[in-house]
């Protein structure tokens, strides 16, 4: 989901920190826009498995980190393209919650699987994360080095339309609901 709000932010953060970035997206236009934003390469998910493409791109070693908002349906490809000692960070479950896992591959590659969500964290931890964002990210937002990518801004009264936009899977970046007053 390189064209999602989180994906577009990750692309910019990786570019800013001089780290390579490979994305998966829903169509060629989204891939083009991700590359324009700073992704090094990518793959249209409807074209099958991305593991071989990532391996060719990254070389035999594979990639160090996968940030995965998809979950179950990407698990096999994610594990295949990670390097020994790599980390799989699961931040969403758009592709399902349950899957079979090749535990032998996990063990042989010493892969760490990390699940992460803000929802389950205590307020004190969320506050600490916000403080870190203010210190490390806000200056880059203020300077324009990193820009939030916003597809549409709609009044909160048009929340249903916002959901339809997102469900249509043609957006690039965030859809924002604006509350006035």
What residue ranges belong to the model's regions?
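Short, well-ordered alpha-helical microsegments
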Residues: 7, 31, 51, 75-76, ...
């Amino acid at each position: 989901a390189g064209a999602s709000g989180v994906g577009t932010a990750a692309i910019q953060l990786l570019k800013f920190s001089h780290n390579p970035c490979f994305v998966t997206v829903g169509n060629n236009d989204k891939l083009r826009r991700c590359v324009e934003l700073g992704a090094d390469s990518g793959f249209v998910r409807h074209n099958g498995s991305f593991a071989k493409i990532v391996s060719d791109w990254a070389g035999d070693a594979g990639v160090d980190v996968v940030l995965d908002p998809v979950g179950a349906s990407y698990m096999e490809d994610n594990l295949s393209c990670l390097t020994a000692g790599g980390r799989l960070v699961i931040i969403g479950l758009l592709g399902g919650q349950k899957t079979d896992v090749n535990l032998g591959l996990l063990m042989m590659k010493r892969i760490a699987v990390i699940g992460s969500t803000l929802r389950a964290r205590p307020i004190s931890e969320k506050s600490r994360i916000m403080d870190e964002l203010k210190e490390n990210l806000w200056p880059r937002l203020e300077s324009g080095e990193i820009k939030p990518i916003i597809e549409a801004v709609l009044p909160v009264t048009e929340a249903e339309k916002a959901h339809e936009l997102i469900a249509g899977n043609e957006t690039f970046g965030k859809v924002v609901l604006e509350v006035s007053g």
